[in-house]
Amino acid sequence: MAAAEPSPRRVGFVGAGRMAGAIAQGLIRAGKVEAQHILASAPTDRNLCHFQALGCRTTHSNQEVLQSCLLVIFATKPHVLPAVLAEVAPVVTTEHILVSVAAGVSLSTLEELLPPNTRVLRVLPNLPCVVQEGAIVMARGRHVGSSETKLLQHLLEACGRCEEVPEAYVDIHTGLSGSGVAFVCAFSEALAEGAVKMGMPSSLAHRIAAQTLLGTAKMLLHEGQHPAQLRSDVCTPGGTTIYGLHALEQGGLRAATMSAVEAATCRAKELSRK
């Protein structure tokens, strides 16, 4: 029998917003961590209510989270994070594994704000983590080994697909997948509205469009096909699909989509420099 995957006894969250709650919910649902072994902190009770409903422990003390948990996920707003790290730095030890989900805060900045040799990772999730179907990338700091990386990847797979990448890819992931959720929604909306134009009721059209995206994504992931191959499989000579694809090409779908990812990535890099 294969050895059980390692799992920390306690996981802490500093910041208790929607993404933190989604990650905690995924960990609990997947049985990776028991609810009573999760401790979350926030300045007020407003965001802590979700953690309390999950059966997690809560506090208003960020230092208490660090003193109780060796794996801590920082899910604060980026502009707040430096002050939070300064607050908890006195209780950080070399035993801690600290994870930041704050967009635009580099590993070098995190390491500068924390004691020497602190083990730090950056994680960038996207909104579908809320339904445990997220696309997540993580980048490790200078003092993080493969065992810590594998542990975090094992945990985050409770929230979707998790890939380790060089830090240089994190901003690209923002353009591709963070912002990509909105791009896909825009396409799904347009797909459904095309059906509405042709006479289908709106609610039905939107359900079918969303299911079409879901089914297509599963085929690409489960069968390992390149999108071009699946697209070719759907086309028949002189059939409906090739006529529709021609219309998309005339509308510049590919170029517009590539430009959208490029624009979002450039903006992410710009924000990272501020």
Swiss-Prot record:
Presence of keyword Cytoplasm: yes
In-chain residues carrying the UniProt-annotated modification N-acetylalanine: 2
GO molecular function: identical protein binding; pyrroline-5-carboxylate reductase activity
Biochemical pathway: Amino-acid biosynthesis; L-proline biosynthesis; L-proline from L-glutamate 5-semialdehyde: step 1/1
Biological processes, Gene Ontology terms: L-proline biosynthetic process
Protein keywords: Acetylation, Amino-acid biosynthesis, Cytoplasm, NADP, Oxidoreductase, Proline biosynthesis
Gene3D superfamilies per UniProt: NAD(P)-binding Rossmann-like Domain, ProC C-terminal domain-like
Name of one Pfam family that matches: F420_oxidored
Cellular component aspect of the GO annotation: cytosol; intercellular bridge; mitotic spindle
Main location: cytoplasm
Catalytic activity: L-proline + NADP(+) = (S)-1-pyrroline-5-carboxylate + NADPH + 2 H(+); L-proline + NAD(+) = (S)-1-pyrroline-5-carboxylate + NADH + 2 H(+)
InterPro entries found in the cross-reference section: 6-PGluconate_DH-like_C_sf, NAD(P)-bd_dom_sf, P5C_Rdtase_cat_N, P5CR-like_CS, P5CR_dimer, Pyrroline-COOH_reductase
Assembly information from the UniProt record: Homodecamer; composed of 5 homodimers.
Protein name: Pyrroline-5-carboxylate reductase 3
Organism: Homo sapiens (Human)
Designated gene of the protein: PYCR3
